[in-house]
Amino acid sequence: MSIRNGMPAADLPEVTWRKSRRSGPQGGNCVEVARLADGQVAVRNSRHRDGPALVFTAAEWAAFVGGARDGDFDQE
């Protein structure tokens, strides 16, 4: 199966979705991530679990996480 950006999250083979421990128990507005077998990272909306998944390379995901950690996206 070819993994592509925007494909239905339900079509991703054998993935374990995770969300932040800071997410509330009701779920609803959470982002979930899954590491794919080839090292890419898929991201989906927990409200629409069968909806589209965004797929990032490991380098793209590392850059995003690093930017978030460093405050690059903080509003001033």
Residue ranges of predicted features:
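Residue-level signal for pocket-adjacent positions within structured domains
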Residues: 7, 12, 49-51, 68
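Mixed-charge, Lys/Arg-enriched low-complexity segments
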Residues: 56-76
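Boundary-flanking segments of nucleic-acid-binding domains in nuclear regulatory proteins
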Residues: 4, 36-37, 48, 72-76
